[in-house]
Curated annotation (Swiss-Prot):
Residues 207-221 have a biased composition (Basic and acidic residues). Keywords: Activator, DNA-binding, Ethylene signaling pathway, Nucleus, Transcription, Transcription regulation. This is Ethylene-responsive transcription factor ERF054. PROSITE patterns: AP2_ERF. Belongs to the AP2/ERF transcription factor family. ERF subfamily. Pfam families: AP2. It is found in: Nucleus. SUPFAM superfamilies: DNA-binding domain. GO terms for cellular component: nucleus. One of its GO terms (biological process) is ethylene-activated signaling pathway. CDD domains: AP2. Residues 271-285 have a biased composition (Low complexity). The lineage of its organism: Eukaryota, Viridiplantae, Streptophyta, Embryophyta, Tracheophyta.
Amino acid sequence: MDFDEELNLCITKGKNVDHSFGGEASSTSPRSMKKMKSPSRPKPYFQSSSSPYSLEAFPFSLDPTLQNQQQQLGSYVPVLEQRQDPTMQGQKQMISFSPQQQQQQQQYMAQYWSDTLNLSPRGRMMMMMSQEAVQPYIATKLYRGVRQRQWGKWVAEIRKPRSRARLWLGTFDTAEEAAMAYDRQAFKLRGHSATLNFPEHFVNKESELHDSNSSDQKEPETPQPSEVNLESKELPVIDVGREEGMAEAWYNAITSGWGPESPLWDDLDSSHQFSSESSSSSPLSCPMRPFF
């Protein structure tokens, strides 16, 4: 049954109804037919039953041809998936072939998301930095009394033995310099009982200082004992000779007598004259003052 026939039936039914209410509907029916049949007016969205798209407007319509088309489309989908599977598997194998390709894929994804999110250049750099491999942290040697600041400098400090107060030693570029500063101060405060970072430096220095001090003490030379012995031996020889001469003179005087011509008086005069000359020639002796 065509659309035109259905439309004619509706018109005829309308005429019958319009006759019951009045004759106005019969007068207007030809105009309505012309309007509906005019080619300028677009057809309604529902068309004849021959087109498969017209059935979608009616939920109660079930066309076997439409069902067949849907089944055919459903059968085509797994075929396409099967055709695409080898290529996807090949791509996956290529991606997982080496870590360099994985890194390239990550960079590509980062670039893609940065472009889609309209990130700033700084944001892109941060994303690239976060994706880079983290370098392993090289732990430096820890020294006693030394710690590192956040900006990379090294500081040294020590506690006093009695008050336990912190003594600031300064800021250094390297950890070794800070450790040496700590060792110097610890050796001054505690001596040999101090625990040092580099004990070999201070032990060797102390032994060298001790050797140098001992050599300095040995430098002043004492007089040679041979010279002292010679001088001490010469003096008693002179005294002994004089005593022997005096003894011989006294012995001769006693034997020859106590006269004025005896040699005893000559010896006494000569000894008296010798003593007066020595007293006058010595600078330490004071001249005798006259009594009058």
